[in-house]
Amino acid sequence: MSWFLVLKCLLTVCIISHLSVSSTESYGCIRKTCFGGRCLHNTTRSCEFSKGCFSQLQEFAVPLLLLNRRVEQRGCSEDNCTELAFSATLGIDWMFSYNHQCCYSEQCNNKPINVSPLSLQPNGVECPTCYSELGTCRPVSLKCTGAQTTCVNVTGQGIREDFIKIHAMGCATQTACNLKNVIILNNIKIDTSCVSGSPPLRYSPSLSTDQKTSSATAPTLCLLAAVLPAIMVMESFSEL
């Protein structure tokens, strides 16, 4: 075989290999962001060398305040996609659920996504619970329910608003343990650690009445501050 034919064969193999790699690593992912049922956009984005498509749903609720919000996102994963689903009950009555799913084919993230419903059935575990942006908080005992069988400690900080500094405790699923730099609500980066069983309460120094009020209302204020940029974007989009 002549050198010309050898080089031609090698070139053909290289081209086929390149096309094969491109076809497996480049595909379209649905791109959508929704807050409270209002969606900013719903398009297909080609994700070259994508690490996968993702679908994410976050839901937080404060039943005492009749507050319930859902944040849904879909798009291309910037890094290797890792699936994660967890739920937690923190503070007085603040419930949070998170579900992040991955897939690896054309528009595969167009399927409906949900979070597991929270059970009200006590499971025998009791955890210290509190929520504060003041650095310390006075925990009270919380009877855990359903799959939330571990006691979690959460620290967090705002990404765009660095004045948001969270310390919280409560009940959580096992999957909420030992999280590092997980971003929730697009604006808060959290770390978590867990303690199994029902640990004893360890009270911080007594808080003033104003501090207790701030601690009780902090979940709502902080979350509203976190999602406010998204609301403003939605409003601007609706006016176009």
Curated annotation (Swiss-Prot):
Induction: Up-regulated by estradiol.
Any single GO BP term: bone remodeling
Residues linked to a glycan: 42, 153
CDD domains, sorted: TFP_LU_ECD_PINLYP_rpt2
Disulfide bond residue pairs: 47-76, 81-102, 103-108, 127-151, 144-171
Subcellular location: Secreted
Job of this protein: May play a novel role in the growth or remodeling of bone.
Name this protein carries in UniProt: Protein RoBo-1
The species this protein was found in: Rattus norvegicus (Rat)
